Amino acid sequence: MERQVPRVLLNSGHEMPVIGFGTAIDPLPEPEQLVSAILHAIEVGYRHFDTASAYMTEEPVGRAISEAMKRGLIKGREELFVTSKLWCADAHRDLIIPALKETLKRLGLDYLDLYLIHFPVRLKKEAVSLEHEIDDFRFEDHELLPFDIKGTWEAMEECSRLGLTKSIGVSNYGTVKISQLLQHATIPPAVNQVEMNVAWQQKKLREFCSKKGIHVTAWSPLAGIGAFWGSTVVIESKTLKEIAAAKGKSVAQVALRWIQDQGASCIVKSMNKDRMKQNLEIFGWKLSDEDGRKIEQIKQSRLYPAKLFINENSPYPSLEALWDGDL
């Protein structure tokens, strides 16, 4: 049975479902597999789909949307919220609008609901394609260019004015970089999509974004299980296991419910039909204040440092520089 997912009102005036279906999957499934998974996700109630140029999943997402309309699973495009992201090699002022148009072409859509800057990083256009990131991969220093916060955002604003996307935002931005962006913005970011879970709670960043009217979306809400950088720190959490047992819920449901209780939304990934459904069963109940206090005590650690952008001769010679000291 299809479930109704609540929506949050963004500062752009548009509403976004608070759970999205993520497509940053490694290893990359066969296109038909992903199309089938997205169709099932639509059947059980997902209405927000998150992709990116770097994920190489835009075409299957678009095919699934087209097929869903043909099958009558949705009445029209407007029932869905589609997010994609600007890759770093396209983060040049004159390349951003063409990059978004290419994304729309791959998706077979006239507009996005949300377009995000994937990282506050600019690469040379000819930089190596990020097909399969591995732990020791690094971009060469000559591939990493100074990031133009002002010019990049001005082009994102133009994407919005042209009607190519309804909302614009950022991803993996810390407080310093958001502050710098806001000095120049005429349209503020609607969303900051960041690593966030019970083991990396991002309290400082969330409070900052809230004051600025920017909604926070959590990627890796279950700590990236299956990714080379991922961890079982959430799923194997003793604290979450105890809370889950007491409430008759799964650990994953408790972890996702905690994110909702913080006023954030999340992007979940699963090709498993049962888990797809379970990940939507987090509404109609809440964690207690005592549960929240216990979760606050969980040891904190960033799981995905994005070392691929760190080079002593690059704009980000250290992780501290990339993440605004928030490690």
Curated annotation (Swiss-Prot):
GO MF, any single term: oxidoreductase activity, acting on the CH-OH group of donors, NAD or NADP as acceptor
Enzyme Commission number, as recorded: 1.1.1.334
InterPro entries: AKR (IPR020471), AKR4A/B (IPR044497), Aldo/ket_reductase_CS (IPR018170), NADP_OxRdtase_dom (IPR023210), NADP_OxRdtase_dom_sf (IPR036812)
pH dependence: Optimum pH is 6.8-9.8.
Listed CDD domains: AKR_AKR4A_4B (cd19124)
Source species: Erythroxylum coca
Sites where the protein binds substrate: H118
Active-site residues, as the UniProt record annotates them: Y55 (proton donor)
Top-level enzyme category: oxidoreductase
Lineage, highest ranks first: Eukaryota, Viridiplantae, Streptophyta, Embryophyta, Tracheophyta
Catalyzed reactions per annotation: ecgonine methyl ester + NADP(+) = ecgonone methyl ester + NADPH + H(+)
Record carries keyword NADP: yes
Pfam families membership: Aldo_ket_red (PF00248)
Tissues where this protein is expressed: Expressed in young leaves. Detected in stems and flowers, but not in mature leaves or roots. Expressed in the palisade and spongy mesophyll tissue of leaves and sepals.
Coiled coil: none
Gene Ontology process terms (BP): ecgonine methyl ester biosynthetic process; ecgonine methyl ester catabolic process; ecgonone methyl ester biosynthetic process; ecgonone methyl ester catabolic process
Activity regulation comment: Strongly inhibited by Cu(2+) and Zn(2+) and to less than 30% by Co(2+) and Fe(2+).
Top-level taxonomic group: Eukaryota
Protein name stated in the entry: Methylecgonone reductase
Protein role: Catalyzes the stereospecific reduction of methylecgonone to methylecgonine, the penultimate step in cocaine biosynthesis. Can also use 6-hydroxytropinone, tropinone and nortropinone as substrates, but not 8-thiabicyclo[3.2.1]octan-3-one (TBON), cyclohexanone, cyclooctanone or N-methyl-4-piperidone. NADH can substitute for NADPH, but with a decreased activity.
